[in-house]
């Protein structure tokens, strides 16, 4: 029997992963990608000699012993790349000079927190004890993997359940020290509503040198996986936007591109945006209530929605790689007031800037409608981006002497930019938490790994799974091919 053919829509990490494992296991795959490069949202680009990186913050799997390490090894994702382990997760500062340094050395963190607030020793010790306990477990694999991975979590299951139900903000309210209370609430990328389990998982990993950085960033990671895919005999057609998934008798049979050309295969896999796949490419013909409920529940503002980049002719030696800077007075962005800024300093990756230079990024929540309305007038849209970059630079100049005068390159990424790059629904770069009424189903089955009534069709990536992360996307591609091998009575292989 001839090898089954698979068309994959999108060369993000989910699509590339599905392509690699498909090729290894005897499927004939081809990827259609709308952009001139692979990676999807795992991307970086150059401005005036500086590299601006969109995706990677903390990459799990840079040290042995986790499922992410194994998948990056299988995909060649880190081949030839140096990796960097962070000494701190984040440093939170006030204008008065108070600092909460989230050291990745747990002993050092515990001592630092107890010095900040001796009266909070009990709650501090509880947090650090949980981080230490989770060190011996691959928690993300347990939460997203099969029954075997879940069973391995049994010794810590009670703690996992407990801390998954407490937000970081609510945990912080238990501290009596006002500064520690407000600082602790911001440690997970300054996101709101995040279970305290998540920073515990991050700290457990970082204390072992994991959840670090691949030197070269997002594009280096994606480029390595693309190289593996091509070396395995795969094919990528760039600048090839899929407009429609072709269906005959409720079976997916091919795709139609923007130029009108049609391409056919035995199986169709979408690694593209979930909404665009279900409601545009398939015209909403194969939808269940939980999918509609999920996409109707989108938040009005999105994390990582605005990213402001600066290329600076200035060194930032000794500065933390991540900072939350509380402001002496609120800053107004998109008609909303913020009392702090989330800042990333790329002084640990020399490939991002020349000698004596550094890239700095500021991340802010954003509303798609605000920028979509502005984009109707291109001049006004660009003026507002410049005003925003200037406004934020003024604030950073107070923290970093000479910041404004050393700026050589600027870029501002809005939700409209993300729609242009990836077709992401309303500019979201990652999925949002499922509403309560479908959270159990999404946790168990994902949002849309398959669609009701449609055969020979599958989805991979963050949107299919309903959970964010580069590792999540890569695992979804692997898991799909493993399932296809089972369906076809093949032994699943991870190498040729």
Predicted regions and their residues:
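N-terminal glycine-rich phosphate/pyrophosphate-binding loop and immediately adjacent elements
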Residues: 2-133
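C-terminal segments that line or cap access tunnels to active or ligand-binding sites in enzymes
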Residues: 313-416, 420
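Mid-domain catalytic core of redox enzymes
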Residues: 213, 243-355
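Active-site-proximal substrate-binding core of FAD-dependent oxidoreductases
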Residues: 247, 486-496
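Rossmann-like flavin
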Residues: 95-197
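A conserved FAD-binding loop/helix module that cradles the flavin
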Residues: 56, 462-484
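A glycine-rich dinucleotide-binding beta-alpha-beta segment and adjacent secondary-structure elements
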Residues: 178-191, 402-466
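Helical element adjacent to the flavin cofactor pocket in flavoenzyme catalytic cores
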Residues: 204-252
